[in-house]
A protein has these predicted regions:
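Extended, charge-enriched "interface" segments that sit outside catalytic cores
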Residues: 11-174, 463-483
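Acidic, glycine-enriched catalytic cores built around paired aspartates
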Residues: 122, 127-129, 134-136, 146-153, ...
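Active-site cores of enzymes that catalyze phosphoryl transfer or operate on phosphate-rich substrates
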Residues: 51-52, 59, 118-199, 203-207, ...
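Catalytic or ion-translocation cores adjacent to nucleophile or general acid/base/metal-coordination motifs
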Residues: 2-16, 21, 204-382
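Short, surface-exposed connector motifs at secondary-structure boundaries
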Residues: 94, 175-182, 213-215, 292
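Short glycine-rich or small-residue beta-strand-to-loop segments that form or flank ligand, phosphate
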Residues: 93-97, 183-186, 216-219, 296
């Protein structure tokens, strides 16, 4: 990314050929030029030789050379943050605008500023993710044996956890905080899970930090966790490190919701309704605390993992949960289908972006709120019936061995696909220990799409009012999207 910015900065700068007589540089630009000269007369002399009387161009050429120094890790000349680079670009832009060269100020130069603001020096942000139990076990290991193994050898997993935080810190040091600042906790159960991560981050560097530079993101996955999410968040914002991050980010907070495990845990119908309810409650909670919330949707590609048309899913979100922002995972099995062709990729992104803007319109928010209230009783009845039916299946005697027999579960577990093992722990014996991907894929390979619908038919049949179901399908986006 730095190389691309360097090339573009030089290209934009070379086109700023206006002389000082026709486009007088501002005092702010002259001050920036003097600062560059103090930093390196070699660079300013080279730029001045090329750009006699063209100060806007000369400043941009020095900026391009400083980006090259950033790539080379030249501590004396490098930009230490993308924000400093953007600030210099805006000095040039303001100078051009004040000189009435607005086409130059808001043309390719503006595009360059947008690129830098969007991608930074790192282009793509790296996110880290680990199971909450791994953190708690690592802390137990450290308390028992000492941080440096004073009382016995630490477990390999503990070393891996500490090394992960050190790697995160190294990435931030080299590429800026925004390059790697999000740490997701799978299976968040309580606020203690968040405390564990900040404690491990502190221990990894063997010294306390004044203000932490990572945002810990709780991931609520199972039905009970979704139901308790607001209580956990209420305790979470009392943690000093979380308060420090909220202050540092201007009140921004991210919360992730898991579609896959909630579906496996409660069945597709109950999971859909529980996720919708959780989003609604979390959005209201965030608003009450003046928190700028982003909900991160951990949707899979398969319908049983929350998959389906993303634009329709956006339009079905509850009021206050989008606010012109929609973050979601794109699973490996759908990446080629959505992004393998440039035309399809553009169409998909435009479709989701349009839905995100439309969902934030007052009329759409009001419709979703009204329809959720109108069909709340129906939803509760469908939820109870579908959940009971799904649990009846899972609790049927002999279901687990039958599932292993009629589907290629064992073989899928051996495939070198995915970023995590098929089961949680080497001794996993039950369906509870089975990860969602092999659960979904095993059904799919047996040509049984059970994970996407099981329990819904029974729930609709027990509800009995076909006219109400049809009306809900026409009026309530959540219900029609699910169907």
């Amino acid at each position: 990314m730095l190389g691309a910015l360097q090339i573009e900065t030089r290209r934009v700068g070379k086109n700023l050929t206006m002389e000082a007589e026709t486009t007088p540089p501002s005092a702010e630009l002259k001050s920036l030029w003097n600062h560059q000269k103090e930093m390196s007369e070699r660079l300013t002399d080279k730029a001045a030789l090329i750009s006699t009387k063209e100060l806007h161009r000369a400043v941009m050429l020095v900026m391009a050379d400083r980006l090259k120094a950033t790539i080379d890790r030249d501590a004396d000349l490098m930009y230490h943050s993308c924000e400093d680079y953007i600030a210099d670009l805006k000095v040039v832009q303001r100078s051009l605008a004040e000189a009435n060269a607005k086409r130059s100020a808001y043309g390719p130069l503006q595009d360059l500023i947008w690129q830098a603001e969007t991608f930074g020096f790192h282009m793509v942000e790296m996110e880290f993710r680990q199971h909450s139990v791994v953190h708690s076990r690592a802390l137990e290991d450290i308390r028992e044996h000492g941080l440096h193994g004073e009382r016995g050898e630490l477990q390999p997993m503990t070393h891996e956890v500490l090394d992960t935080f050190r790697a995160l810190g190294s990435i931030q040091k080299r590429n800026g905080i925004k390059a790697a600042r999000r740490y997701i906790i799978s299976f968040t159960k309580s606020a203690q899970n968040i405390r564990d991560v900040y404690e491990l981050n502190r221990l990894a560097f063997s010294h306390p930090k004044d203000v932490p530079t990572i945002d810990v993101i709780p991931l609520f996955e199972q039905l009970e966790d979704l139901q308790n999410s607001v209580d956990v968040l209420e305790e979470m914002i009392k943690i000093p490190e979380v308060q420090a991050r909220l202050k540092a980010t201007g009140g921004k907070m991210e919360v992730m919701l898991g579609y896959s495990d909630s579906s496996k845990d409660a069945g597709p119908t109950s999971a859909t309704l529980a996720l919708h309810s959780a989003q609604e409650r979390i959005a209201k909670w965030a608003e009450s605390h003046d928190i700028d919330l982003t909900l991160f949707h951990g949707r899979g590609g398969a319908v049983g993992r929350g998959g389906g048309p993303a634009n329709r899913a956006v339009l079905a979100q509850p009021v206050g949960s989008v606010k012109c922002r929609f973050k979601l995972t794109e699973q490996g099995e759908v990446i080629f289908a959505r992004y393998g062709n440039p035309a399809l990729a553009i169409r998909h992104v435009e479709s989701v972006a349009a839905a995100t803007l439309l969902q934030s319109a007052p009329s759409v928010e009001k419709r979703n709120t009204d329809m959720t209230a109108k069909y709340a009783d129906m939803a509760n009845k469908l939820d109870e019936a579908a959940h009971n039916r799904f649990l009846d299946l899972l609790n049927t005697d002999g279901f687990a061995p039958w599932f292993s027999t009629v589907t290629p579960l064992t073989e899928i577990g051996l495939l070198p696909i995915g970023s995590r093992p098929a089961k949680r722990g080497l001794g996993a014996k039950s369906l509870d220990d089975l990860r969602t991907i092999p659960w979904i894929f095993s059904w799919a390979q047996a040509r049984i799409n059970l994970a996407a619908w099981y329990g819904l038919g029974t729930a609709c049949e027990q509800f009995g009012d076909l006219n109400t179901l049809r009306q809900a399908y026409e009026e309530w986006p959540l219900f029609s999207t699910f169907i």
